[in-house]
Swiss-Prot record:
The protein's annotated pathway: Carbohydrate biosynthesis; gluconeogenesis; Carbohydrate degradation; glycolysis; D-glyceraldehyde 3-phosphate from glycerone phosphate: step 1/1
Protein name (Swiss-Prot/TrEMBL): Triosephosphate isomerase
Keyword Cytoplasm appears in the UniProt entry: yes
UniProtKB keywords: Cytoplasm, Gluconeogenesis, Glycolysis, Isomerase
Places the protein is found: Cytoplasm
InterPro entries associated with the record: Aldolase_TIM, TIM_sf, TrioseP_Isoase_bac/euk, Triosephosphate_isomerase, Triosephosphate_isomerase_AS
Active-site residues annotated for this sequence: 94 (electrophile), 165 (proton acceptor)
Main location: cytoplasm
Length: 250
């Protein structure tokens, strides 16, 4: 059985005050039935690590990682640096990185491999724009993004978490219906099964990321192939984040 995960992606938001508030909120969270992860901006990883008690079981992650391990790459952050700060996971291929920083599937694959070299678990994002969905190209776009990662082979893919983020539902207030989310998640799992076998595909966690809120989380997480969520704006509210975590518990 796949253990649910709720991962908070603060994006370029937050403050030291929020770090402290979140630390207090998560101090007593029960992670026995659901994995809880928070990905703050890079400067807040250290403070959040100190604010959240080690015994809580809450994990920390980065929002991005360099495809390079070290060198003259101003502004980049290496996987080993994230690991040294206590991160266990890192988001790779988020739609905002793909769109705003022109990250190609090739770059995403390089970052996946860089994260794994550092001992991090990549959360690999795939998803389609509104134009692609309206054109009936959801499976074509998501399949292409997914295939680039699946080609790395089962030994790599079994170490990943996938996240489906319909770009048209990120920060827009629009949310994929549970039926829409389940349909794409089922497609992703079947694509993985076709490439690498059903046993691996059934173990592969697939998160949903697209305007998940306390009010819709339970219904979305109730879908057969949805294994939790990659939470954006709602992860900035400690009380709301706790509600979403509660909704993910089996």
């Amino acid at each position: 059985m796949r253990k649910p995960m709720v991962a908070g992606n603060w994006k370029m938001n937050g403050s030291l005050a929020l770090v402290n508030d979140m630390g207090r909120a998560l101090a007593d969270v029960d992670c026995s039935a659901v994995d809880v992860l928070v990905c703050p901006p890079f400067p807040y990883i250290g403070p959040l690590r100190r604010a959240v008690p080690d015994e809580s079981g809450v994990a920390l992650g980065g929002q991005d990682v360099s495809r390079y391990d070290s060198g003259a790459y101003t502004g980049e952050v290496a996987g080993a640096m994230l690991a040294e700060m206590g991160c266990r996971h890192v988001i790779v291929g988020h739609s905002e990185r793909r769109a705003m920083h022109a990250e190609t599937d090739e770059v995403v694959v390089d970052k996946v491999q860089a994260a794994l070299r550092a001992g991090l678990t990549p959360i690999v994002c795939v998803g389609e724009t509104l134009e692609a969905r309206d054109a009936g190209e959801t499976e074509q776009v998501v399949g292409r993004q997914l295939d680039a990662v699946l080609e790395l082979g089962g030994f790599v893919v079994e170490k990943l978490v996938l996240a489906y983020e319909p770009v048209w539902a990120i920060g827009t207030g629009r949310t994929a219906s549970p039926e829409q989310a389940q349909a794409v998640h089922a497609f992703i799992r079947q694509r993985a099964a076709d490439a690498l076998g059903d046993e691996l595909a059934q173990r592969l966690p697939i998160l949903y990321g697209g305007s998940v809120k306390p009010g819709n989380a339970r219904e979305l997480f109730g879908c057969a192939d949805v294994d939790g969520g990659l939470i954006g704006g709602a992860s900035l509210d400690p009380d709301g984040f706790l509600e979403i975590i509660s909704a993910a518990r089996p």
